[in-house]
């Protein structure tokens, strides 16, 4: 019996699950294939920050794409809870990007003065900053406050998207290896897997840092590379920080239950997920230098994730020029959680022939 779908999605991280969710909502027959379990790699490791201004500089197209995606989260969280019953722990707690040098002060003050229309961004002097976050180090020179930024639980988001996809008619096959792509002339017609052959009008590769290995089999030279990031979490009694704190080389994300997630190192061009003492020592040094009370925190755990980066530094969301019936969505690097909602919409629009998003051409190039 031929197993035919409208779309096959290869990759069960947050990007693949977001695409499956959007396509299932539109009544498409979708199969998502994951070689491990959902949210098993970068989506499991991510801190879940929704930081537009802290992660993306300037007022370019990718910034506006990220802002649009961030603003989708309140309704997405509600929809996922109603459909799947799962809470993605979305909070709009705001984010503060710290300045520690005079050069950083000038840069952030200028950023605040040039904030895009409608974006609530403001500079906080040291006194104002300490009234917001009194436990920060008194050596901090001020901060850029972005009240609309927030965070989610990245694993729960991915799992909720997957569950909601299934409840809307999609199928998900975990622990399934993709052996090869099936072809007819210059068109991809499906995939050959450890659980059989599956056919579809469109195959979407959304395998994160591993996407390039899949594309290599088709002669598609996708220029991307992996970046390892190490993180750790601690528990503190009460709240020593209300908002996400971001500074060069380190972020501190408050979560439910007194947990703080702290990350992340950057080790490019490696798939080795080993956690190093050097990486953790550097993070601990940076984190305690801006939030001294962390020295008394209770250690919880450490982990590492592999993030996909492109040579152009922007994600790729679009069709293959070489193969009909093949689309690609990867390269989101540190912004996979932030960009997941809009990526799902863009890719679902693309498959339906609606290349109407004004930023679509930019992120595909």
Put a short name on every predicted segment.
Residues 144-202:
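Helical element adjacent to the flavin cofactor pocket in flavoenzyme catalytic cores
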Residues 5-32:
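N-terminal Rossmann-like FAD-binding beta1-loop-alpha1 element of flavoenzymes
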Residues 154, 291-365:
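C-terminal catalytic lobe of FAD-dependent flavoproteins
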Residues 49-132, 286-288:
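Dinucleotide-binding Rossmann-like beta1-alpha1 core, especially the glycine-rich loop
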Residues 18-26, 35, 48-50, 54, ...:
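Active-site substrate-recognition segment that forms the wall
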Residues 86-97, 110-111, 122-168, 265-270, ...:
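Helix-loop-beta segment of a Rossmann-like dinucleotide-binding subdomain
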